[in-house]
Amino acid sequence: MRFQILGCSGGLGGSPRTAGQPGKPFRTSSFLLDQDILIDAGTGVEDLPVDELRRIDHVFISHSHLDHICALPLMLDTVGSSRERPVTVHALPETIHALKEHIFNWVIWPDFTEIPHFDHPWMVYSPLQVDNPITIGGRTIRPIGANHTVPALGFHISCEQGSLVYSGDTLPNDAFWRTVNGIADLRYLILETAFTNRERDLAVTAKHLHPIQLAEELNRMRVDPQLCITHLKPSDREQIAREIEAWAGRFQPRILQTGDVLDID
């Protein structure tokens, strides 16, 4: 199982120039599972070639915020006419409602559940429920409840060789840690840390982690996966990374970057 990081930033922009060369662009949350499953649909999706976009059959959306869905309308528009079957968008009922009301509403973007025809759409919805897993080609995706400002999910993704957990945007909660600590074959734990410690009040309001709280939450972990961190705000990326090292360095966190790959084999 191959989990490719298409985007994992908390915003846009690029890293500083080095030796006169442009820095790497930051891309928002989007991850490619093997070749056919997309986990979130942020701006990282835009870097995939068209033939790779065409292979994506399933999109799992953690929640309705723009940085996790913004590439979905354009992706569907790009490949819909050249596919033989619709792309299935898996999400909470509340997230599906938000997509219908605010994105695919014929005002912001066409409704691809009606194009080119009701009987032959480019997109179909599949509602998710927490702890109700879906198996696709030997990979099982189990939705995990998240604690965010809108209804949200994380995902436990597993195959015969092992598994990973992607928290999505969340303040981890008791149910989250019960799930994580019950996974014997957990290879990777992907958590977000969006803000610096000086912005802790904003982090709490926005329901994102800051480094001190990340360290506090990690003390609840009873398994030993590789810890991966995402969603750092580009404007404070270096400061957030330093604070993560200072407060959670004993857990050997890895700050993920666009282009990284997590293999489970």
Model segments located where?
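Metallo-beta-lactamase
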Residues: 93-152, 159-160, 250-264
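Short internal beta-strands
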Residues: 87-94, 228-230
